[in-house]
From Swiss-Prot:
Protein name per Swiss-Prot or TrEMBL: Exoribonuclease 2
Keywords: Cytoplasm, Exonuclease, Hydrolase, Nuclease, RNA-binding
Residue pairs linked by disulfide bridges in the UniProt entry: none
Any one GO molecular function term: exoribonuclease II activity
Amino acid sequence: MFQDNPLLAQLKQKIQETLPKKEGTIKASDKGFGFLEVDSKTSYFVPPPYMKKCMHGDKVVAFIRTENEREVAEPSELIEQSLTRFIGRVKLFKGKLNVAPDHPQLKKLSLKAKTKKGLNEADFQEGDWVVAHLVRHPLKGDDGFFVQISHKITDANDKIAPWWVTLAENDLPNSEPAGIDDWQLKDDADLVREDLTALPFVTIDGESTKDMDDALYAQQLPNGDFALTIAIADPTAYITPEDEMDKVARERGFTIYLPGRNIPMLPRDLADELCSLMENQVRPALCCSVTIRKDGVIGDDIRFFAANIKSHARLVYDHVSDWLETGSSEQWQPSEEIAQVVRDLYAFSQARANWRETHAVVFPDRPDYRFELSADNDVVAIHADMRRTANRLVEESMITANICAGKTLQTTFGFGVFNTHAGFKAEKMADVVELMAVNGAPNADAETLATVEGFAALRRWLATQETSYLDNRIRKYQSYSEIGNQPLPHFAMGLDVYATWTSPIRKYGDMINHRLLKAHILGKAPVQTPDETVGEELALHRKHHKIAERNVADWLYARTLADEPAKETRFQAEIFDINRPGMRVRLLENGAMAFIPGALILDNKERIECNGEDGTVLIDKEVVYKLGDVLEIVLTEVNQENRSLVGKPTQVFADLVSETQTSAEQPAEGAENNEPQV
């Protein structure tokens, strides 16, 4: 009877006009209530009845009123809803379609749903994975929440779910682009391709690699220098900037690499066949030749040219590594011609690695963790693959090639697609200088560290320290690597300029650089120039791909390690992050990440302190763990819903003995001599 009473509505409006308003973000609890977080120090309680009008993550304006002598927030206006397009699972209530969002704070919600036009509700079963869109919200004046299902991802128990769901969540494709029936070579009429089919190029890749995009040749000269030629697959020979396939490649940005599978940027018939530098097959290629001095310095005779080449040997990383490291390989016996090419490539790579270790930055070796899957998408094993001699040989070749491209694009055009890194964040430089001064780092003043040479020298000094603690500490002061169209330095690599062009089958930015390098060869204006937005586009693609890769891995780790808490399996783990709630570690055996709450290190808030600023864990004010430490842990929880791992150290910290206890436990004076006590 009071619901539509205009007088009551008028009175309510007048009361609300007198109430203060606050803007903030809703943080939900699993108990029905929530909080309006205004800033890092201010929050207001949101009672359960008011929480029914909003959900976790919503940005809202709320009235602040007093109820039961407590300030509470009543959300009144929606600024930005947390859910728009989202991934969820079907819930059926009395035959009616509902969707539960696949989000840790929202999983308990069950939102009424319908399918979009063209989908049949009967095709959706309990637990099916779907893409949904929130189309009604109470704070928009709607009667409750309501969602529309736009797409079914896969069935409830499909083991492919980790891949398909993660790709859908990040709005990424789950298959290669469609090819065309008849690929045509579209070279510029003035482009001359040199015939290098007689030169004994070799490819070195993984055993199952099909999209072989680089072939190498080196010859050590009588004076000890090296004549190096790098040949790179040439998809821009078939794809022009105006082609529809170019738009597809730009939209994808990169080949997507996920645990156990990849989603190509280009059609497989192009990437794995027509452009792949297969053994004994003539292929168009973009090439770079350069002399590398025996001391590892790159010569000034950098030359880019187009060619037709033929790989004379399709080699495998492990076979080549075995042969170089032990003198033989059971799986591979090279001809003398190929053996000499590999020996010279190896000698060149050592010269370059030595130069980079002395003058630039060499990243520490870390294993690549590889999931081995069954035909049913179950994890059979997780392998920790260390980079071996052949991997480093190829890496040095690619880095050399990309330095050559960077220099050429910088000189010829002053633009291109460059990988850049700005070193330390300007606002953090004072912190870096202070930290390094305390720890005795040489030449670590702000002016020096603002140069590539000074930054690289500090990184080399950090690499000589006994532990990786300072290295880990300093990382949070560094900028992120970027992609841009200006030839800026790459501080993290210790290089003045760096432009990748060695993976055009897998990276759209490399395709752009190929077109620029061809313009350089022809002495013509480029058919494509990188605009201001291309770097941001590619960086965003790369970010989403990395998130997808990590999310699939987390899902597979949760599946694979589900039984380990019950088994109390012990793992060696490295600390890579410490914050106030606890520390994050990486299991060295398989690469899984786990969180260790402070309470599972020592359940006494008075005694333990997790200091994120210093990267240390202290007990009774003594450092017990720090960034980079390796410790033994057991997993205590594997949460399949959230795809997360929780662990605790096997080390047990003793209870603090009070002075009173200590006095009581000490023998009275003379007791050890059995003297009578008076």
